[in-house]
Structures are given as C-alpha cells and as structure tokens.
Amino acid sequence: MEALPGGIGVTHLIVYDTPGPDGLIGGSPHLHFACSEAYLVIKGQGSVQTLSSNGFREVALGAGSLVWFTPGLIHRLINQDGQLEIFALMENAGLPENGDSVLTFPIEHLADEDCYLQYASLERAGSASADSREAAKKRRDLAVEGFLSLRTELQQGGSLHRFYSQAVRLVQPKESTWRTLWQTGPASTIQRTKNFLDKLRTGASDYLNRGRVFEVPLDPAQEERRLGMCGTLRKYLPEGEIIASNAAPG
C-alpha cells in the first residue's frame, strides 16, 4: 500500500445547493488546526468566504480555479449557480478524518465536546459526516449563524481570539492521536525523500528498482456519497493498491 504523493488526501465535493439563514447557498463554515487545504474547481461558479485576523475576504471560484489556505483560516463555500464541484486536496491525510476541524457555531455551543457534538451531529470518533440531509442542513445553518457573528465582530474592531481559544480547547485532547498519525503517515513521506536524496548523493541507483504504479480501485461502496460539512463527498482513500503487472516474464 502506498500513500498519495506528499501524504495528502483527495475528496470529490459537490457543494450543497440549499440556502443558509442569510439566503446564500453553500456549505458549513469551519477551520482546520494542523492541515492546509486546497480547492481545485472542476465545475460551476461560486466563491469561498474567509475570516482571519486580517478580516473578511471573498475569493471568486470557477472551473479551473485553484485556491488554498492554511490552518486558522475560517472558510465557507458559496455555490452561486448550484453547480459547484471541487476536488479538495487536504494536507496530512488521516488528520481531517480524525477531527481536524471545528465548525463556527455560536460560542455557547463550543462549551465542551459533548455540547459541540450534540449540535454538530457528529459521531464520537470525530467523523465529519452527518446522518441525514436535515441534520446536515441544521448543522450548516448554525455554523453560518456563528460565522456571521464573527464577521460582525471583526468589522466592529474585535478579534477571533475567543473563538480560537475555545476551538483549541475542543480539539486539544486529540493532539497525541494526530501526532501519531502524522509521524507514521505524511511525515514518513518526507523522510523517504531524504533517503532518496541520500542515495543520489552517493550515486546509488538500486532504489529505483522499487518503482511501482498504484491506483484507487473502483468500488461501488466507495461511490456512495457521504454528507460532509460543505456538501456530498466521495473520498479517495490515501493508500492505493499496487497494479499487478500482466507482462509475461521475459
């Protein structure tokens, strides 16, 4: 089994096509703590609204757009024409699947993990999938309410400090699990590159004999889309299966 290049995760995302409490169609605003994320737009028109210590910003999205952002940036996808489809590329595969995100619920819903999960409709393991479209919509709407409050606070000269502090308290207990996942997964790909460079320094070529091709096999079970934070998801598992050679021995 082999990780995707750079230890990333890939997800096909069809952004929700229902309006939020402010009338804008789109997904649930949230942020990540240890992973950068990129959006490669393959269809439709929309935007990503963001909040950071620099305030509010909106970036237009269309087919071919590529945008990315670092941990701490609160982001909300807007599906302007109802057709927005994206490949989401997530750093550090394994961490997002194990809870590296917090939705922008109003601060009173971030009091503790039990309170947060109750309103987020998440599994205890930290899954980002809801169990029904109604649950996903309710969660999205609550996150939008919190997002709008944070935006107003920033516009009035406030900061994100209180929200950030409470969000970190929610995810801090997961740090040791995330560290283990990172050390045994994405970080190991960096060490492997170092090993390759060490080989090149000495002029060795033997490691090239281990080159192989991998794929994520088509599996009907994997084609069943899940309800995520921003839309319906089709995940591509980060570990691919080797494609067996059919060549006759020479």
Provide a role label for each language-model segment.
Residues 2-15:
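N-terminal regions that are enriched for targeting/export leaders
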Residues 12-32:
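Conserved short histidine dyad/triad with adjacent acidic residue
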Residues 33-48, 90-91:
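Short, conserved beta-strand element in jelly-roll/cupin
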Residues 51-71:
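Short acidic-glycine-tyrosine-enriched beta hairpin
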Residues 73-76:
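Short, charged beta-turn/beta-strand-edge "cap" motif at the junction between a beta-strand
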Residues 81-157:
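Double-stranded beta-helix
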Residues 124-208:
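An accessory alpha-helical subdomain
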Residues 181-250:
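C-terminal non-catalytic accessory extensions
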